[in-house]
Regions:
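Glycine/charged-rich beta-loop-alpha catalytic/anionic-binding loops adjacent to active sites
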Residues: 19, 110-118, 229-238
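Structured adenosyl-cofactor binding patch, chiefly the S-adenosyl-L-methionine
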Residues: 97, 135-139, 153-166, 224-272
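RNA substrate-binding interface of SAM-dependent RNA methyltransferases
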Residues: 41, 67-70, 79-81, 103-198
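N-terminal positively charged helical leader segments and presequences
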Residues: 1-88, 188, 267, 271-272
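Glycine- and other small-residue-rich loops at beta-strand/loop junctions that grip anionic moieties
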Residues: 2, 28, 121-122, 147-148, ...
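Amphipathic alpha-helical repeat scaffolds
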Residues: 32, 124-132, 245-250
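Active-site/ligand-binding-proximal alpha/beta "capping" segment
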Residues: 192-240
Length: 272
């Protein structure tokens, strides 16, 4: 059992809370029963499992440890002070994992008929990003494109907010010019953008079956270079004194409109 806070392995794991170390290693730290369980279920590449026996008291937790050991995962037992130095949860559950990040290169992606993707341009809040990942999973959106200078989806706050969806939605990083070139060869993926100034109400829009919902940053919205790529621009009408919605909320509203529209189409087809 590791009891030293200065143990070299523990120090290296602790550094994964920092962006530069996650980028350098291609790894991230996931904490908690649910997230570790979903990592195992999804076939994520788990490099190390960190266990605190005094905190990991549930039968499900022990089942996760047994599964990891059968897969040959390196399992490290640590005491409570050491685990607390790694944890970000208010009430640590005694289990965490060091996991390899998963990315797909934009140029390798080919849209399949009926797929729903989401693109986020310069999103800065990791909690918003994690929440959007969770919503993508819920509505069946298969890919999330992070455009330009987005926050890290493997930030601990994003991983926590995703509730395990970090393992089920494919992630891609790119920038405006590369995205424009890619879309020139994949125009079957219809881009729907959002703007407060758009004429079309999101609830009155017929969304294409193969669709990418493109959302701008929390403060600036979509730049003109992205608006020019959009086939449709929609807005969410608002009353009251506020002039904008939280990005994760706005994304969720439109995604569920798309989802419900698709559900109604499938139900209607099934009744014919």
């Amino acid at each position: 059992m590791i009891t030293s806070l200065s143990n070299s392995t523990i120090v290296a794991i602790r550094k994964l809370h920092r962006l530069k170390d996650r980028r350098a290693t291609g790894l991230f730290l996931a904490e908690g029963l649910r997230v570790v369980g979903q990592a195992l279920d999804s076939g994520a590449e788990i490099r190390q499992l960190i266990i605190c026996p005094d905190l990991l008291i549930s039968e499900y937790g022990q089942q996760l440890v047994d599964r990891a050991r059968k897969l040959g995962v390196d399992c490290l037992e640590v005491n409570e002070p050491v685990f607390a130095s790694l944890a970000r949860k208010d009430t640590p559950q005694g289990i965490a994992a060091v996991i390899a990040q998963r990315w797909q290169v934009l140029e390798s992606l080919t849209p399949q008929e009926g797929e729903l993707w989401v693109g986020l341009q310069a999103v800065q809040n990791p909690g918003n990003l994690g929440t959007i990942l969770r919503t993508c999973d819920a509505v069946g959106a298969t890919r999330l494109l992070l455009l330009d200078d987005c926050t890290d989806p493997y930030d601990p706050a994003a991983v926590k907010a995703s509730m395990g969806s970090i393992f089920t939605v494919t992630l891609t990083k790119t920038h405006a010019e590369a995205f424009r070139v890619w879309h020139t060869g994949h125009e079957e993926m219809v881009i729907v953008g959002t703007s407060d100034h758009a004429d079309e109400d999101y609830a009155q829009t017929v969304y294409p079956q193969t669709c990418l919902l493109l959302m701008g940053s929390e403060r600036q919205g979509l730049p003109d270079e992205y608006i020019q790529l959009c086939t449709k621009m929609v807005r969410i009408p608002m009353e009251g004194s506020c002039d904008s919605l939280n990005l994760a909320v706005a994304t969720g509203i439109i995604l569920y409109q798309i989802y419900n529209q698709r559900r109604n189409i499938f139900q209607s087809a099934g009744q014919q």
